[in-house]
Amino acid sequence: MNKILDISHVYAGYDNNPRIIKDISFSVFRNDFLGIIGPNGGGKTTLLRTIMGLIKPTEGKITFYNDQDMSVSKINIGYLPQLNKIDQKFPITVHEVILSGLSMSRKLPAFTIPQRYKQRVEVVAEQMGVEKLLKRPIGELSGGQLQRVLLGRSIIDNPVLLILDEPISYVDKLFETNFYKILDEINERMAIILVSHDIGTILSTVRNVLCVNESAHYHCGTEISQDWLDKAYDSCPFEIVGHGAVPHRVLRKHQ
């Protein structure tokens, strides 16, 4: 299996805290489906921002690989942020939102959009089930509809890696099931990194698991033990409710 991303002993953070994540090492492979879990404040978002090049590591190395397994300076990455970070009052249509995913990697004409780009938008909209909403302003969409549109935006340029940050935190349970079916289809074409607080969802959806709590614990597969989770979450005790691929409950630190 070919690597697309290799992270080796990476430290990163911000001016007021340059070591939010510490000595993190793991790899992502082509068509991989990696789930990232961990307590709030553990560094999950910092890790994502570092992978996307928004934060520069203070130590360590991030290496990307092309189809020929040669190291390259970057790869095409799609990103779906948390839904609550999207301004639905912004005057833009569904078509324009999906199309904007192309403008991030190539310069689009200011006034006339080439037909091939319009066709690409239509293909992606149909894949997302929003083909009848292309002319609708995003302010008129439900949470589930908007998330489908944003997912379409993140994949329209055929990225090698798709990063999802808590993608279903603000949508209903009915949409959640359909959303993960869409991800399964997308995963046939690209690798996915999925961040979620829902351990049950992670275990039933992904192939491998990474727990980020300043440092990182990688687990190949999803048959993880309570001992492994205890070690991974460290100072954030929790309990697993039920059996198998089930939701978890995070508890306050024990005194």
PLM regions: where:
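Catalytic Walker B motif of ABC-type/P-loop ATPase nucleotide-binding domains
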Residues: 162-166
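Helix-to-loop junction immediately C-terminal to a conserved catalytic motif
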Residues: 52
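ABC ATPase nucleotide-binding domains
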Residues: 223-255
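Conserved ABC transporter NBD signature motif
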Residues: 60-77
